[in-house]
């Protein structure tokens, strides 16, 4: 058996219905049920891997395990039996190289307050009675500064064990989030989108300690590429679908084809035929024409 078994990894497209508890008639069948493609999707869905988690002002603290309880229990039961027989050097360790969280604001930029994201160990939480960050893997960002990416990494592998006796809780890495300073806003003020990959190992190790990494993301500029041509096409796309083809104030509207032919916001250049007669074609532009309503006919200007 390999020293490392990968239970899952995924992204926002990782979705599946929650399945049944893993089981099998042999070691091979059990391993298949634990780490098959179907099982990977099921446990990813259980722990909301790649799913958005809503941070609400009335629920400022949130926590999720990086591996669901049912999967840890199944692995621990199998590994313990192998360990007791001397077939494995340990009951197993959880290895998580890194966790990346994408934070997005869902309120206006003037909103006060901040978000703190922490990497936790439920074993430490059980001893301390509070969710504390391990290895200083904690970062705080102001809501007004979002969007942002936060990367966290532990310096050790988490033992696969039960805390508090046989009926206790499985020890596991987890992500805790906390809202602070949010005033006067109800509902969700931000969402987090976490990505990670967890491995089960028979042999543990320690790793170089790194501080949490925070990367500010440039907000998408929806107007930067909006030149006159794209603005004209945008208006046409809206107005042509919303034109009422009935009567307006007793007068028939122009057809959609006629409206689409009008050159909004841009004065046409002189046409060869007009130049020959000393005449310039021009299109009248008004609030009505921009809104998709009929525009006046071309006018002639005599030089």
Swiss-Prot record:
UniProt subcellular location: Host cell junction, Host plasmodesma
Biological process, per Gene Ontology: transport of virus in host, cell to cell
Pfam family, one: 3A
Presence of the UniProt keyword Transport in the record: yes
InterPro entries referenced in this protein's UniProt entry, alphabetically: MPV
UniProt keyword annotations, A-Z: Host cell junction, Transport, Viral movement protein
Region annotation (Disordered) ranges: 1-24, 267-303
Biased composition (Polar residues): 1-18
GO cellular component, one term: host cell plasmodesma
Chief place of localization: host cell
Its job: Transports viral genome to neighboring plant cells directly through plasmosdesmata, without any budding. The movement protein allows efficient cell to cell propagation, by bypassing the host cell wall barrier. Acts by forming a tubular structure at the host plasmodesmata, enlarging it enough to allow free passage of virion capsids.
Family indicated by similarity: Belongs to the bromovirus movement protein family.
Protein name per its UniProtKB record: Movement protein
Taxonomic path: Viruses, Riboviria, Orthornavirae, Kitrinoviricota, Alsuviricetes
